[in-house]
Amino acid sequence: MYVKITDAEARMVDDDGPMSDTDLSTTTDGAARGGLRPATIERIENGLVVVLAVAGTLTIEPGLWWFPLAVFLAFDLSMVGYLRSPAAGAATYNAVHTYVWPLVLAVAGLVAGTGAPTLSRWLTLVSLAWAFHVGLDRALGYGLKLADAFTHTHLGWIGKDAGTNPR
């Protein structure tokens, strides 16, 4: 049997039973204890990915500093799934907005190595540009999409729905 509880009720109960108003040490958001919320930590981490992707690009090919910016919107072509439905759009968007594929390209670049230096360099540059895109999206709060709405992400609601729960 399942019991539906409100968000407020969920925040007031932990494994040891009901919390008092002054017992904030067991909350999961960290903010009550003076810490950072998990979404904030994730945004900071993704900002670091952006910095590392730029540094990697500058290290590999300083003259192509503009490359991550030039291909930035190409990764957003994955939103084409939204023409079908929010669920299809979330699936195609999330399939592209993950660190898995940039990692696969980076490994392919390493494997190509000295046997094909031009291929290796371009695979690595594309992987860095892809990681730059994903990292910047998440650092700005554009997380992985949930199937119910484009504006509903794993980091919360975005756009006109930010700070609300429209459903």
What are these regions (language model features)?
Residues 2-167:
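N-terminal membrane-targeting hydrophobic helices
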